[in-house]
């Protein structure tokens, strides 16, 4: 059994400039833990694989294509591959999001 604590995982240096930690990385999937402080946002980008966002804390706004929705804890949002998406935190509370990409992307996300 492998156990990994998010708090003991290093923060990745990404163009998004937010707290992003890769907590699972396998050829079948990739899992990223993101913390968005109030006012922070991911940059619009396109991922070459399907992904979903699971809200652990806070109430971030999820943008997928032309749609956007502010979502609550324990909500799952699907994001199909090759569609522009981003997550923003317009609230006054921290937002924590689990991002699952399957299968693991072979290339990097494309920033817009």
Where are these regions (language model features)?
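A short, N-terminal "cap"/entry segment at the start of jelly-roll beta-barrel domains
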Residues: 1-28, 77, 108-112
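A generic "binding-loop/recognition-motif" signal
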Residues: 27, 38, 48, 67, ...
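Conserved short histidine dyad/triad with adjacent acidic residue
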Residues: 32-47
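Histidine-centered metal-chelating micro-motifs
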Residues: 41-42, 61, 77, 81-87
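Glycine- and acidic-residue-biased ligand/ion/polar-headgroup-sensing regions
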Residues: 49-60, 65
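Short acidic-glycine-tyrosine-enriched beta hairpin
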Residues: 66-81
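Ligand-binding loop in jelly-roll beta-barrel domains
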Residues: 81-106
């Amino acid at each position: 059994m492998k156990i990994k604590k998010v708090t003991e995982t290093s923060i990745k240096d990404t163009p998004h400039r937010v707290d992003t930690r890769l907590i699972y990385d396998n050829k079948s999937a990739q899992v990223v833990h993101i913390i968005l402080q109030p006012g922070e946002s991911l940059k619009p980008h396109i991922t070459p694989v399907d992904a979903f966002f699971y809200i652990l804390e806070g109430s971030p706004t999820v943008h997928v294509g032309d749609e956007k929705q502010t979502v609550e804890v324990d909500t799952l949002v699907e994001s199909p591959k090759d569609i522009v998406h981003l997550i923003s935190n317009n609230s006054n509370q921290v937002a924590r999001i689990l991002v699952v990409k399957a299968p693991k992307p072979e290339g990097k996300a494309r920033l817009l």
